[in-house]
């Protein structure tokens, strides 16, 4: 019997791409039986410059780390099926379409430039491979409307507000 895990990811960024930008990521894992909601947040470092794209990718890394922890804690090692929901077409596109091409091209785009956010993308790919290692499992990515991702984006925004008020 497979183990199913659902994680919604989201992010918030103030002053996106500016020198003084701050960003936060969130991953909210839910399981129906027993009902459980695990909330994970992270504030992005200021270097490299925080952007909404980096925050969304960092949310994916949080989600995959959460899944890996959960998988390691399972008693019988069932097939592990992870469903990641995101309102970021950038993140979903990377993990479903572009990563294979970029890997073959040495993490370069069609023009020969090193892809943006390579560090986070490589980390996400490594974590995805770790989650599916052992056979029988998979990670699926679903692009959802922003309004469906309201809670997780709110969590990221609140984490960022909390962080910026504390400084």
Name what the model sees in each region.
Residues 1-55, 66-72, 159-166:
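RNase H-like nuclease fold core
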Residues 16, 60, 64-160:
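RNase H catalytic domain
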């Amino acid at each position: 019997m497979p183990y199913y895990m659902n994680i919604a990811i989201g992010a918030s960024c103030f002053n996106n791409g500016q020198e003084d930008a701050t960003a936060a990521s969130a991953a909210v894992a839910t399981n129906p039986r027993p009902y459980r909601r695990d909330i994970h947040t992270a504030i992005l470092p200021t270097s490299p410059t925080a952007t909404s794209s980096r925050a969304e990718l960092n949310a994916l890394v949080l989600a995959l780390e959460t899944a890996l922890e959960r998988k390691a804690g399972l008693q019988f090692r069932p097939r592990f099926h992870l469903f990641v929901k995101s309102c970021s077409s950038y993140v979903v596109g990377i993990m479903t379409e572009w990563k294979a091409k970029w890997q073959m091209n040495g993490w370069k785009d069609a023009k020969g430039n090193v892809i943006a956010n390579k560090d986070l993308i490589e980390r996400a790919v490594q974590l995805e491979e770790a989650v599916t290692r052992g056979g029988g499992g998979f990670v699926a990515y679903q692009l959802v409307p922003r309004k469906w991702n309201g809670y997780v984006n709110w969590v990221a925004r609140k984490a960022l507000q909390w962080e910026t008020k504390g400084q």
